[in-house]
Regions:
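Aromatic-lined carbohydrate-binding/catalytic grooves of carbohydrate-active enzymes
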Residues: 74-116
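Catalytic domains of carbohydrate-active enzymes, especially glycoside hydrolases
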Residues: 60-87, 219-223, 346-359, 424-428
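An active-site-proximal structural segment forming one wall of the substrate-binding cleft
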Residues: 66-74, 124-128, 156-159, 196-232, ...
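Substrate-binding cleft of secreted/luminal carbohydrate-active enzymes
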Residues: 340-457
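Active-site-adjacent "subsite" loops/lids of carbohydrate-active enzymes
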Residues: 35-59, 137-219, 273-277
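Aromatic- and acidic-residue-enriched segments that line the glycan-binding/catalytic groove
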Residues: 89-102, 144-189, 228-268, 321-331
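Bacterial Sec-dependent N-terminal signal peptides
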Residues: 6-9, 14-38
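Substrate-binding cleft/loops of secretory-pathway carbohydrate-active enzymes
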Residues: 144-147, 151-152, 234, 302, ...
Length: 457
């Protein structure tokens, strides 16, 4: 009986690791030398739009706040240099420079204009490095414009250049296949698709972003992180380009498009799945995986010392809706999520293509500690399993938008977020410096980080 039970156990273990090419002892992230303590990195995100009034025209403000960042105990900043409207805050010839961004002022949004001519990113690099901080840049990857609420109109590449309309993603809506550029206040009254996404499967789109990354890699950066390197949502992309590539991938024609893939208007996992539904999810994950491979190569071809990574949301159980598998190829997704993952879905996990991941462990104020998704600690614990030691990651909170955080006044909980995340991952990640300034969380962050550092002594 014991021998027979052991055999069954071995078979089960092999099944659960069927996507792994190594299948042996896992590469534990924290290393094999138990006597060596590695000090974990602490990252703070600097959103372009939210912080634009402070930094767009003032190096003094940048120095003021980066000094506070350093004093609070952070090791890294992540500077957003391509906001969701798709223009940039670094030197490149392939898209325009940001001139104005939407900012919250009083009780509404308005535009704030940049009049300075100095290099925005270079200022952060120079000041950050002088303070002993590592400086990373992030870009919103597959975006090309914004249609704003509050009557602000629109801006971005897709609105300036009609010839690029086919770069925009096509949605499988209940009203039919719809290019996002055809959505406006009448047919999208809630402005759900105000941020105009690009089609990740479009070769011209990919080449455009790859050139952006090559130009960005010319800077003396410590790292580059891709944000929104994904599909807009489950309903995208249903363009002719994507259909043709999908048919090539599966080796057959789709007779009834899009219904054989997904019924129009589907916004969540359907109870009855069309013929190609799960294969389509696999295909989208492959598109993103293959682009990540190209993006890494593009960055490293310019400067192979730059750390290459992504920002992702930690909610893996539903992240297939964005077309992203950020897990290890050794993690057999179908064994845990058979309702949406094929047996080949795990082949397109991209963790082993990265040097680092920033993980949005975004949970409410009453869900800091825990063991499952939608707790900060649980998000990080789960990620350890998902990543299988392929890449280090830093998890952390959104302290301005999640439930309980919106109105501030949570200084007592900030140290708990540090403790919960840094001890369950390889670092700490905080979104965003804007909320630290708004709610004056500097001392609370220093307390939390100091508490962690004391455990190393």
């Amino acid at each position: 009986m014991k021998k027979w039970s052991l055999s069954l156990l071995l078979i089960l273990m092999l099944a659960l690791t069927s996507c792994g090419s190594e299948g042996g002892t896992p590469k534990w992230i924290w290393g094999n030398d138990s006597t060596k303590t590695t000090v974990k990195s602490r990252y703070i995100w600097i959103d372009a739009a939210a912080n634009f009034p402070d930094y767009a025209n003032s190096k003094d403000n940048i120095e003021r706040d980066l000094t506070k960042v350093k004093n609070a105990g952070f090791t890294d900043i992540v500077v957003d240099v391509r906001p969701t409207m798709g223009d940039v805050l670094f030197n490149t010839s392939v898209v325009d420079q940001v001139k104005k961004l939407d900012v919250w002022e009083g009780s509404t949004y308005t535009y704030y204009t940049r009049t300075a001519t100095w290099d925005y990113l270079q200022a952060f690099i120079d000041i950050g490095h002088s303070l002993g901080l590592r400086v990373n840049a992030s870009i919103n990857t597959f975006v090309g414009g914004c249609l704003y609420s509050y009557g602000l109109g629109e801006q971005g590449m897709l609105f300036r250049d009609n010839s690029k309309k086919d770069w925009a993603t096509t949605l499988n809506m209940s009203s039919g296949l719809t290019n996002e550029m055809d959505l406006n206040t009448s047919n999208d009254p809630n402005n759900t698709y105000g941020t105009k996404f690009l089609n990740p499967a479009n070769d011209s789109v990919q080449n455009f972003v790859l050139q952006l990354l090559k130009d960005l890699a010319k800077y003396n950066l410590d790292g580059i992180f891709l944000d929104r390197c994904r599909y807009d949502d489950l309903s995208s992309d249903f363009s002719d380009v994507s259909l043709e590539k999908f048919e090539d991938y599966i080796g057959e024609k789709v007779t009834n498009f899009p219904s054989d893939i997904m019924q129009p208007g589907t916004t969540s996992l359907p109870s009855t799945q069309p013929k190609y539904f799960k294969k389509w999810l696999e295909f989208r994950a492959k598109v993103i995986h293959d682009f990540i491979v190209k993006a890494r190569a593009a960055v490293k071809s310019v400067n192979d010392t730059i750390k290459f990574g992504t920002y992702v949301g930690a909610w893996y159980s539903t992240y297939y809706e964005s077309g992203v598998n950020w897990a290890s190829t050794k993690y057999n997704t179908a064994a845990y999520y058979p309702e949406w993952a094929t047996s080949d879905y795990c082949k397109y996990g991209y963790a082993d293509q990265l040097d680092y991941i920033l993980l949005g462990a975004y949970a409410s104020t009453d869900n800091i500690y825990g063991s499952g998704e939608w707790t900060m600690q649980g998000f990080c614990v789960n990620a350890m399993t998902l990543l299988e030691g392929d890449v280090k990651f830093a998890g952390g909170p959104d302290i301005g938008n999640a439930t309980g955080w919106v109105n501030g006044g949570q200084s007592s909980l900030i140290p708990e977020t540090v403790d919960a995340c840094i001890n369950a991952s390889n670092g700490y990640f905080l979104f965003d410096i804007y909320y630290v300034k708004e709610f004056n969380y500097w001392n609370a962050l220093k307390t939390g980080i100091d508490n962690y550092l004391k455990t190393l002594k």
